Amino acid sequence: MDRRIFGIENEYGVTCTFKGQRRLSPDEVARYLFRKVVSWGRSSNVFLRNGARLYLDVGSHPEYATPECDDVVELVTHDKAGERVLEGLLLDAEQRLHDEGIAGEIYLFKNNTDSAGNSYGCHENYLVSRAGEFSRLADVLIPFLVTRQIIVGAGKITQTPRGASYSVSQRAEHIWEGVSSATTRSRPIINTRDEPHADAEKYRRLHVIVGDSNMSETTTMLKVASCDLVLRMIEEGVVMRDLTMENPIRAIREISHDVTGRRKVRLANGREASALDIQQEYLTKARDFVDRRELSTPLIEQALDLWERGLKAVEADDLGLVDREIDWVIKWKLIERYRAKHGLPLGHPRIAQLDLAYHDIHRGRGLYYLLEKRGAVARVTTDLKIFEAKSVPPQTTRARLRGEFIRRAQERRRDFTVDWVHLKLNDQAQRTVLCKDPFRAHDERVQRLIDGM
């Protein structure tokens, strides 16, 4: 598929301190956060003018789903716009608390685990053709997804009975099976629940729930662009070596705990291979595929270059090669500098605080954003583009239709209902348009609906 629809959903961790002590429950904090949303949307599950969906997920986790994007950099921009939308809600909620005499600070974390060991996710969505055999897609993709954490993980300090250690992935500990239709109870690598949000005869939606939430724009870019390339190879029937793992769930944990990328995991055919070996295999195939099909674009070259440097950095233990571009490395360098300066062990509470503060989305407080201000991290988008994406949908996908419809309905104060595929005016005629093609950004039926308001 030369043109693909992408989407990212991020759940955010919420906490509130009251003069340093937690006072409000996550449920109460979530209510404060979403009060503004509920006042105009009459619900804590709304679609926005930029085509995105914002809602309160299970367990009081705010979740932001980007609009449909057909370009990876645009996707990164809209993912960041989600952070800004939530940061706006946070500032508004803090002001409300203050007005009510509650001296509280609200924190929103774009990470995947809280101190109690609960996990929440970052889900990637890739539109794939209905034509192929899904089981083959999963077979080829799972070894890639299990091992890619060594280049796209967000990093985490893990407390173990033997002391603290650094893991490359936050999410790996919480994945329990390879392919499944559940997302919460038994967390799989690929979720198969068949909701394409598109013409089900043509498409299905690949729902990858194994990834970490990334702060780094370049890491998100690599995560999505590399997966897209692997999908393209599968779709075009490129012959891949059988890298099926004997036990992918054990492998994902073992790989996460090994920052050298060298730990061998057992494959189903009895061979052993490391995360570096397996990723190198996919990278070599991808480079060859891009050259042979003449698919090269600046973005693909940037992704392949970072993929290669990421593997080289891990293999040679020369993390400086990617210490501005890969989340787990950026964070590790930050932690190591702080430890050296203050003479602290990895298990010290101040280091755990640092680990968490990296994911704070408040731009005046979060450590990732302090690094960004100093020019210490690489970027793929700009603050201006992110600001625009808070209110302007992608112009080349169905999100444009949804965004335009919502904008006009709100301006005209009309009652409406939307989801990913339906646009409905709640008037006497109950006019509804079904938009089954996510690639279609112009539709006369929608235009008539908008003009008729």
From Swiss-Prot:
Highest taxon of the lineage: Bacteria
GO molecular function terms listed in the Swiss-Prot or TrEMBL record: ATP binding; ligase activity, forming carbon-nitrogen bonds; magnesium ion binding; ubiquitin-like protein transferase activity
GO biological process: modification-dependent protein catabolic process; proteasomal protein catabolic process; protein pupylation
Pathway note: Protein degradation; proteasomal Pup-dependent pathway; Protein modification; protein pupylation
Annotated binding of Mg(2+), by residue: E9, Y55, E63
One family name in Pfam for this protein: Pup_ligase
Function per UniProt: Catalyzes the covalent attachment of the prokaryotic ubiquitin-like protein modifier Pup to the proteasomal substrate proteins, thereby targeting them for proteasomal degradation. This tagging system is termed pupylation. The ligation reaction involves the side-chain carboxylate of the C-terminal glutamate of Pup and the side-chain amino group of a substrate lysine.
Extra remark: The reaction mechanism probably proceeds via the activation of Pup by phosphorylation of its C-terminal glutamate, which is then subject to nucleophilic attack by the substrate lysine, resulting in an isopeptide bond and the release of phosphate as a good leaving group.
Protein name as catalogued: Pup--protein ligase
Native species: Nocardioides sp. (strain ATCC BAA-499 / JS614)
